[in-house]
Amino acid sequence: MCCSERLLGLPQPVEMEAPDEAEGLPSKQKEMPPPPPPSPPSEPAQKLPPQGAGSHSLTVRSSLCLFAASQFLLACGVLWLSGHGHSWLQNTTDLISSSLTVLNHLGPVAWLGSGTWGIPSLLLVSLTVSLVIVTTLVWHLLKAPPEPPAPLPPEDRRQSVSRQPSFTYSEWMEEKVEDDFLDLDAVPETPVFDCVMDIKPETDPASLTVKSMGLQERRGSNVSLTLDMCTPGCNEEGFGYLVSPREESAHEYLLSASRVLRAEELHEKALDPFLLQAEFFEIPMNFVDPKEYDIPGLVRKNRYKTILPNPHSRVRLTSPDPEDPLSSYINANYIRGYSGEEKVYIATQGPIVSTVADFWRMVWQERTPIIVMITNIEEMNEKCTEYWPEEQVVHDGVEITVQKVIHTEDYRLRLISLRRGTEERSLKHYWFTSWPDQKTPDRAPPLLHLVREVEEAAQQEGPHCSPIIVHCSAGIGRTGCFIATSICCQQLRREGVVDILKTTCQLRQDRGGMIQTCEQYQFVHHAMSLYEKQLSLQSSE
């Protein structure tokens, strides 16, 4: 059956004339209308399909329906295995029913004519569809399910929230790489205990209130300090204090912990933040329980009420009234130096208004030749009182006169003279200004340069130099970084190795919380790695 017989009733195409021939004809012939279309017969003849066509061939329409059905079954199988098959099957069935209803009303379409496919075409379509179905099912079955994230063990909870350092390896050298700087939130110098204490103004020594706080709420300033109110071994009645097993174990750790690092080990460890983080959190803080101090009015002498001097090493001021323990109190500790030498440094808090006179009493009493200040006057809030004069001031009979101020890129050096009666002394005051607010420096060379300058100034004082006073705001974070860097530089020069872990433990024995944050602990390792490289270059030259 030919196509012209099937498509009866449709207008037949008119044969178009060539342009050349049409131009040569008379105008009357050009305007002749086309012959009228033949009228459709009243009863179109219907031809039967060829014998055997239904059993050995497949129409285009049926082939497309078969292909669509196979794809539908494939999608059903995949979605059924994934758990969404039931709802998807119902929705798709409704859609197909609606589509078939619309197609039935459209009538025959020219391209779905009587064309047939032979058996080879049918086999090719079936083979292709089967191959697609089998490949998809095998891929779905062989695909490994995603592994659920492993929960962190309880002891790693604190490590998981630790900040990344605000410096990179490329920033240890003198050149700065702008792309390496990380914009991080502020790191508070805050010890970690179990609950949070709300601190009243310094003039109001009222009772303290305790409330629960999440970790993110603690990340403020040093005012939001924490306090363990349930220390094992603490006697609730009275002020008696017993050493708990936990504290005894912490004391043993501080005495025995050590990890000697050679040059290559130091460089590798400085680049491993996870190892440094795990090591830092193993070191006990060794903070002082406030119950150890039963001194009325002590709150007026401390900048932060939970950062107190460890009793065995604290500095005691000479006082004309031995019955008044408050007059001899200052929040400061003697710190041992390289090889355990006693009273090499004094770590203290940044003076407040009520302790400026006590601070200068300590400077005169200890015959201090050098003061190192590593904080700004204000960083979000007050960190230190400006305890030195513009020109001259007198505190407790000590006349303090600023002779000269030297400005450098990273610090300011004040040459100060002290006079009491007929005795006169000289004092160097280094104010390190390159430590950024609430985080560690981006570069280590400025701190190493300051350490070298202070060491040279101390050597000029002779072999028996009096203690060097170092302070920041609380007297434990940046102060600990400076003292640890100074001690480790001496060890690296003399022994060729360095033990930062042992140095940190020694500092915390003398004053709790020294090197206060993990970021500061990493920074000390980076500074020492850079210093070792500098020593290697000098020796090779």
Curated annotation (Swiss-Prot):
Active-site residues, record numbering mapped to chain: 472 (phosphocysteine intermediate)
Residue intervals of the Tyrosine-protein phosphatase domain: 276-531
Pfam family, any one: Y_phosphatase
Enzyme class, first EC level, given as a word: hydrolase
The UniProt record lists the keyword Endoplasmic reticulum: yes
Phosphoserine, modified sites: 221, 244
Catalytic function, reaction form: O-phospho-L-tyrosyl-[protein] + H2O = L-tyrosyl-[protein] + phosphate
Compositionally biased region (Pro residues): 32-43
Name of the protein: Tyrosine-protein phosphatase non-receptor type 5
Organism (species): Mus musculus
